[in-house]
């Protein structure tokens, strides 16, 4: 049913050039890379005309809102995953950003731009390296193939993702070696001050 509802909006809705959808861990989280990208979108005047939607699971909506408010960030739209509003956002946003994968029924429309930041450095087995889980890599591969940009913090991560998900002959997109957005925390004076106060 979810797939049918989503496809309906994919076919019907035009792309909104000023809408950005952000999702972390299929809506299970709302921090990490997604938080730092959202923060930039909210605080940088160059993006004042854009609407940023963070998609989270129903039980996470209140804690996500409280988290962003505690950081002094307002203007974010929180959307519950697997709802009408979610399907509409996914089907109409010009820009799609995920640190994992979108749900299996996701289809990228022509004209949409997808940035995948992944969410960590692969120090554990992934993809085909997980012997008893190879049947589950299809959705991850699909998301990587759909991505216009794949962001990695280092060549180790990039090479492992390409190898473990067998992307070499599948992906013809752009690999960005620019570090993870969440690593800006190491250079943020406010964050440094908060940590010192908390642990002093």
Q: Where in this protein do the model-derived segments appear?
A:
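N-terminal pre-catalytic "stem/leader" segment of glycosyltransferase-like enzymes
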Residues: 1-85
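A nucleotide-sugar donor-handling region in carbohydrate enzymes
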Residues: 2-4, 121-127, 139-200
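A structural signal for isolated positions on well-ordered beta-strands in alpha/beta enzyme cores
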Residues: 21, 51-53, 115, 149, ...
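Glycine-rich nucleotide phosphate-binding loop and flanking beta-alpha elements
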Residues: 28, 103-104, 157-159
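A short acidic (Asp/Glu
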Residues: 31-35, 63-68, 107-109, 126-127, ...
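Extended catalytic core of nucleotide-activated donor transferases of GT-like folds
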Residues: 35-39, 44, 71-141
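Tryptophan-centric aromatic hotspots in well-structured domains and transmembrane helices
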Residues: 54, 114-118, 165, 169
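Helix N-cap/beta->alpha junction signal
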Residues: 56-58, 100, 153-156
């Amino acid at each position: 049913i979810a797939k049918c509802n989503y496809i309906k909006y994919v076919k019907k809705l035009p792309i909104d050039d000023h809408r950005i959808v952000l999702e972390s861990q299929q809506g299970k989280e709302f921090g990490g890379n997604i938080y730092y990208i959202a923060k930039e979108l909210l605080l940088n005047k160059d993006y004042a005309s854009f609407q940023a939607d963070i998609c989270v699971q129903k039980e996470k909506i209140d804690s996500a809102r409280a988290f962003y408010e505690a950081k002094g960030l307002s203007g974010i739209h929180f959307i519950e995953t697997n709802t009408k509003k979610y399907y509409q956002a996914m089907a109409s946003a010009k820009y799609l950003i995920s640190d994992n994968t979108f749900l299996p029924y996701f289809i990228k429309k022509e004209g949409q731009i997808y940035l995948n930041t992944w969410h960590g450095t692969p120090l554990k087995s992934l993809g085909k390296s997980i012997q008893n889980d190879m049947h589950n890599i299809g959705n991850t591969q699909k998301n990587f193939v759909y991505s216009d940009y794949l962001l990695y913090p280092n060549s180790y991560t990039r090479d492992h993702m390409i190898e473990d998900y067998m992307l070499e002959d599948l992906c013809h997109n752009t690999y960005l070696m620019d570090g993870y957005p969440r690593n800006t925390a190491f250079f943020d004076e406010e964050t440094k001050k908060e940590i010192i106060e908390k642990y002093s």
